[in-house]
Amino acid sequence: VMLRQPTMIKIGDHCSINHNNIFQAGRQTGTITLGNHVLTAANVMFVAYSHAYDTREIPIIDQGYYDAPIVVEDDVWIGFGAIILAGVTIGRGAIIGAGSVVNKDVPPYAIVGGVPAKVLKMRATDL
């Protein structure tokens, strides 16, 4: 597991973080917060910052970075090799399919997959 800016990362109780996970928090608002009972497969990446690119007249490398928080609520399962990008909230009980790139919020109890990740279906409700 690799932690960039570890003071910006909070992991809840009873989480299972598999090997090769990368947590890249930002320096200002790019916190990464995992709730309780979160399960990640191997090779998951959390990236709470990115290059700024708003001005065409300035090379991207010279424009700096922006960051935004990532929030993973309780009881979420994140599949192998998924990438969670800055500014995303993953709702309680959601499942993120293997290899997905999550660039938008995920509703509670949604099952998402793909690049970019889209809702495939909702988890069944209790009887």
Model-derived features: positions:
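Residues that flank catalytic or metal-binding motifs in active/ligand-binding sites
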Residues: 42, 98, 108
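Flexible, glycine/small-residue-enriched loop-and-beta-strand segment within the central core
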Residues: 1-88, 115-116, 123-124
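C-terminal end-helix/capping segment
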Residues: 106, 111-127
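Short-chain dehydrogenase/reductase
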Residues: 16, 77, 95, 101, ...
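Short conserved catalytic/interaction loops centered on acidic-Pro-aromatic/His motifs
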Residues: 51-53, 91, 107-109
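Beta-rich strand-turn-strand
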Residues: 79-95, 100-104
